[in-house]
Amino acid sequence: MFELTGRKALVTGASGAIGGAIARVLHAQGAIVGLHGTQIEKLETLATELGDRVKLFPANLANRDEVKALGQRAEADLEGVDILVNNAGITKDGLFLHMADPDWDIVLEVNLTAMFRLTREITQQMIRRRNGRIINVTSVAGAIGNPGQTNYCASKAGMIGFSKSLAQEIATRNITVNCVAPGFIESAMTDKLNHKQKEKIMVAIPIHRMGTGTEVASAVAYLASDHAAYVTGQTIHVNGGMAMI
């Protein structure tokens, strides 16, 4: 698909469905993959599945000291991060008028502020090497909004604006910054939806099915590869036509 042999990638949120799929696809293309997450058992299971060329980097992204240490450890243990995939994210849904400050704060902290801090840590070294790929996994919700998710949508829209600005700042250093925005993707969470709930979702998707983690991961692999060397500041939407942007 996209040749990544010898490239070193750090994938945050690799213990989740999309993050795990991204790690698998990058690894299959020859990359050495650093797996970040908070669910240690899932990370270890994924590492066992992948075999060699894998390193684990557990960290709590809500803790700024752990975020800084994550960047430093990944740089040291991987001997330089060539590909940074900011995929980790959380939700704390609720109607705006009932949303508590802590629910706003933690979503912005993990989804947006931790991404800023980790990217800053890694980018400093990418600039020194004059090479790098930064891919931020946002969401269709960041582009079109979603009731009950003002905090989540704000964080994901923020990632898109962040990526466009950073892309302009570091393009001359041979570093690209792009986003992948998934729509409804098959996961343990969507598996719990009943038939009526799934039917309602399908009406909004012209392709009439949910996407797979591998389809999202394939877009990430493209942006990480030399095939996308002339692509920066862009968002690839993987949503089955749910939002044609």
UniProtKB/Swiss-Prot annotation:
Binding site for NAD(+): 11-35
Annotated binding of substrate, by residue: 139
Source superkingdom: Bacteria
Protein name as catalogued: Nodulation protein G
Function, as annotated: Proposed to modify Nod factor fatty acyl chain.
Keywords associated with the record: NAD, Nodulation, Oxidoreductase, Plasmid
Family: Belongs to the short-chain dehydrogenases/reductases (SDR) family.
Any single biological process term in GO: fatty acid biosynthetic process
Active site: 152
InterPro entries reported in the protein's UniProt record: 3oxo_ACP_reduc, NAD(P)-bd_dom_sf, Sc_DH/Rdtase_CS, SDR, SDR_fam
Alphabetical list of SMART domains matching this protein: PKS_KR
Lineage: Bacteria, Pseudomonadati, Pseudomonadota, Alphaproteobacteria, Hyphomicrobiales
Record NCBIfam families: 3oxo_ACP_reduc (TIGR01830), PRK12826.1-2 (NF009466), PRK12936.1 (NF009547)
Molecular function GO labels: 3-oxoacyl-[acyl-carrier-protein] reductase (NADPH) activity; NAD binding
